[in-house]
Structures are given as C-alpha cells and as structure tokens.
Amino acid sequence: MSRLSHQDLRRGFRELIASNSCYHTASVFDPMSARIAADLGFEVGILGGSVASLQVLAAPDFALITLSEFAEQATRIGRVAQLPVIADADHGYGNALNVMRTVVELERAGIAALTIEDTLLPAQFGRKSTDLISVAEGVGKIRAALEARVDPELAIIARTNAGILPVQEIISRTQQYERAGADAICMVGIRDFEQLEQISEHLSVPLMLVTYGNPALRDDARLAELGVKIAVDGHAAYFAAIKATYDCLREQRQIFTQASDLSATELAHTYTQPEEYIVWAKEFMSVKE
C-alpha cells in the first residue's frame, strides 16, 4: 500500500487552506489516534499542547512540557500519520532563537503545519498567564520560524488570543504577522461572526479558529466565506479516552460508588493535580489569581 510522504502531507495541508471549505480537526495525541482519524476520513489532525502535556506528563496546561518531549510525541505520530497534522507549538518554547529550534525539530518530526502564539509563556514572575508579548517580538518569532524551515511546504501559523484584545488591536497584530510572512493566522477567543467579520476583512491569508465548539460559530459555510479554513473544536477524543480507561479499570476493580463516577473533565482535573501548581506559583512566583 502506497504511503504519503511528509511533503505530500504538507502539500495536502496547503491545498486545504487554499480551498473554499472549512475543515474540522481531529484531536490526535499518539500514533493510534492518528491512524484512526485518517481511516475515518478526517482531512487534518492537531496535536494540542495541552493534550501533549496530559499524555506525556499527566500535567495541566501550564507550559511545563519541553520542546524535546513535545517533538518526541510529534515524531511518534509523524511515523504513521496519513493525514496532515498541525502541531500546537505554544510559544515556540522560548525566544525567537528557540522558535527556530522548534521549527527544525517539528519539521523533522513530519508535522505539516505548526502554530506559534504570542502569549507570554511560561508564566512570568508576578505576571498573569494571559499576558501577550509585544507585537515586535511576535513578528520576530514568525520571521525566525520562516528562516528556520527547510521545506517551504511546512506552514507557519501565527496565533493570537482574540478574546482578551480590542478588535482594532487584534487587526493590527494579525496584519503585522501576515506581513511578516505567516502562512495563516490562528485566533482563539472569537465570540461570534460579527467579531470575526470585523477582523477577517482586513486579512488576506487563510484563518484558523480555536472555537472549542462555540455554538455562535457553528456554520461551516459562513466560516469558509470569512476565510476560516481550519476549525479546532477541542480535544473530545482525548478526554473520551481518559474516561474509557478509567471506567474500564474501575470495573475491573469492582468500584461502583457514586463518588467514583467521574466525568472526563473531573478525571483530568483529579489526575493532573493543578492545585499543587497553583500553590507553587503563588509561593515562588508571586502569581495572584
């Protein structure tokens, strides 16, 4: 059986974002899930940073995973993936020079596209975790990513948080990332089509939205009209896998108490122990809630 090469998959991703349709991502977190997603007909998958942290570290999404750990998981997926996979590369694991290293490692892993976000990560001493870096630094990261890639088919996607910025600032940021050469713009936190339309009319590159299933954005035809080619609804498959594992093991142990009947969200919270990290952040980093 013929297999698609990494470059074939990257070309395939380019075709998706050049089309007139909006495609929803499958959450892929290991080789098996990548094969399942492709077999079920998904056109594109995504390895989420939060999911990688859960899968590799059993840790909450506090930017604790390292580039090496993330790239190793991406490589495992890349060995078998027969659909284009987007890597959520967070902040590029450091400054612009770290971003270059990130691109090198993820390109070798076989990733078709990667997002670099402008959130100030990891959380800084005395700063909120939602703070953003300056536009100038964000532009530098995108330019560095483009410089580092060897295969021009690898898509570099600039990501920003539209949920915490005024519309005009979102427009300004994303326009500058576009001018820096980003192949697409990813936004998280878009509220509705009105806000999306205000922003999209100022951009010419394809858009990617992290919607987390926002019901106000459930119209694929309208998303496509506004330039959205990729929609990320979340990572339900991963959380369903956690739930299935827990329920299977619970049944083996014959534990059927009401207190043990936990939802996937409750399980993730229980076993990643975020309270510990919050306490440590307050104690060692002066981070206020």
From Swiss-Prot:
Cofactor remark: Binds 1 Mg(2+) ion per subunit.
Top class in the EC scheme: lyase
Name by which UniProt lists this protein: Oxaloacetate decarboxylase
Subunit-structure text: Homotetramer; dimer of dimers.
Family under the similarity heading: Belongs to the isocitrate lyase/PEP mutase superfamily. Oxaloacetate decarboxylase family.
Binding site for Mg(2+): D88
UniProt keyword annotation of Lyase present: yes
SUPFAM superfamilies (UniProt xref): Phosphoenolpyruvate/pyruvate domain
